[in-house]
Amino acid sequence: MKNTQNHLNMSYVWMICLVAACGGLLFGYDWVVIGGAKPFYEAYFGITDPAQSGWAMSSALAGCVFGALISGWCADRFGRKLPLIISAILFSASAWGTAVATHFDWFVFYRIVGGVGIGLASALSPMYIAEVSPAEKRGKFVAINQLTIVIGVLAAQLVNLMIADPVASSAT
């Protein structure tokens, strides 16, 4: 009976860790996918100024800085789960907002909102994973978060490749 209970507990820990590590996946994905979207949002918003284009790309990182700065306070005040849920809501709002933005300022605003969510998750995901993991397996579980960041980067590069190929083909 005890062996079955341990197996169920480890399955639960794995599930928690994989869900929490989605913060890393989103961080890696969002960090890179904007590069592939660059020609599309530049054309859509009529961007010709390199500074404006750079702001569109880096604005999420400004939000990340803010999210990371407040993450410790949020974790101490509200625990780990609620701020992680809020980070997922912020990222979802960012995805929706950037998709429907009709003005460049709104596009940047929603990129910053998503950045705050990613900044929260990038600090809180490994913290939460470490807290729910058994001490003897903590390193393995926390490393999953870093792995998901790299998987997010890879996924974004693959998406960018799929987007860029048709654009390059139609340009010739």
List each model region and its residues.
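Transmembrane-helix signature of 12-pass secondary carriers
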Residues: 1-172
